[in-house]
UniProtKB/Swiss-Prot annotation:
Family: Belongs to the desulfoferrodoxin family.
Induction and repression of expression: Up-regulated after exposure to oxygen stress (at both transcript and protein levels). Repressed by PerR.
Pfam family, one: Desulfoferrodox
Gene3D superfamilies: SOR catalytic domain
Cofactor or coenzyme needed: Cu(2+)
Cofactor remark: Binds 1 Fe(2+) ion per subunit. In contrast to some other SORs, does not bind a second iron ion.
Catalyzed reaction equations: reduced [rubredoxin] + superoxide + 2 H(+) = oxidized [rubredoxin] + H2O2
Organism phylogeny: Bacteria, Bacillati, Bacillota, Clostridia, Eubacteriales
Organism listed in the record: Clostridium acetobutylicum (strain ATCC 824 / DSM 792 / JCM 1419 / IAM 19013 / LMG 5710 / NBRC 13948 / NRRL B-527 / VKM B-1787 / 2291 / W)
Protein name according to UniProt: Desulfoferrodoxin
MF-aspect GO terms: electron transfer activity; iron ion binding; oxidoreductase activity, acting on superoxide radicals as acceptor; superoxide reductase activity
Length: 125
């Protein structure tokens, strides 16, 4: 398994789907086609979306943005995902939480963060 994710979003409903395995058919939400989103790796807006990774031995601490991302009901990080080899681990967030996650026994991989307004962001470990 590589560290790429296939995530599709409905532009009207905001529904996001992580595709683990597909057969080549188009994904839809109701009658609306879903669009595959591509993760951004750089952010001109004061680095508020790119996951910031700190290694502590074989553990990592992830915070979203070198300047902490806001967490309000209108604008927040919905989840952070670690992809490392055959491992996929998710931290689901709510607006009352900090945009942070910890993952254990990690030596390499990619971390993804999804902002409800500004889409998908990633950083390699």
């Amino acid at each position: 398994m590589n560290n790429d994710l296939s995530i599709y979003v409905s532009k009207n409903s905001g529904t996001a789907v992580l595709l683990l395995q597909g057969n080549g058919t188009d994904l839809t939400c109701g009658s609306e086609p879903m669009a595959k989103i591509v993760a951004n790796t750089t952010d001109a807006a004061q680095e508020k979306h790119v996951p910031h990774i700190t290694k502590n031995g074989n553990n990592i601490d992830v915070s979203v943005g070198s300047v902490e991302h806001p967490m309000t009901p209108e604008h927040f990080i919905e989840w952070i995902i670690l992809v490392s080899g055959d491992r996929l681990e998710m931290a689901k967030l709510t607006p009352d939480m900090k945009p942070r996650a910890q993952f254990h026994n990690v030596t390499s991989g990619t971390v993804y963060a999804y902002c409800n307004l500004h889409s998908l962001w990633k950083a390699d470990i």
